[in-house]
Amino acid sequence: MEISGLEWFRLHPTIFKEAWTDDEFVWPSRLPSFLVKVTADDGRYGIGEATSQIWYLGETGDQIDACLRAYDGALRGCDAENVALAHRAMEATVSGGMPGGRTTRSGVDMALYDLVGKARGLPVHALLG
């Protein structure tokens, strides 16, 4: 089962602060967030979420979008069931320290496990052990 491509959809979640005052923390009202869809050559797909804590990782929506574009090309043709190989392909394209890379890889990772679970008829928690 080979990866035929990635699709992503930008979300616009709103953050509601409960305990912090504006002068304590810089707390954005929105987070960079995407749903990530990894589709296999047989039509099956998995869904993941890539949401960054912008105040901690410093990753913007545009950076995540750029990484998703790079990963889309890098992952086409890769074995969808070999998650470690997919991570190597992503890291070879956009290194772990590049803004957007960590968040994006986590969303693709979730989508890959969802896809593999669907292909094997197993929930993701059974794959992870």
Language-model regions, residue ranges each:
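Structured beta-strand/loop patches that form or line metal/cofactor-binding pockets in enzymes
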Residues: 1-45, 51-55
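Metal- or metallocofactor-binding catalytic centers and their adjacent structured scaffolds
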Residues: 5, 39-119
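Residue-level signal for pocket-adjacent positions within structured domains
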Residues: 15, 70, 122-123
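Short capping/connector residues at structural and topological boundaries
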Residues: 16, 80, 127-129
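Residue-level preference for alpha-helix termini and adjacent loops
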Residues: 19, 54-55, 74, 123-127
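Catalytic pocket of metal/acid-base enzymes, prominently hydrolases
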Residues: 115-129
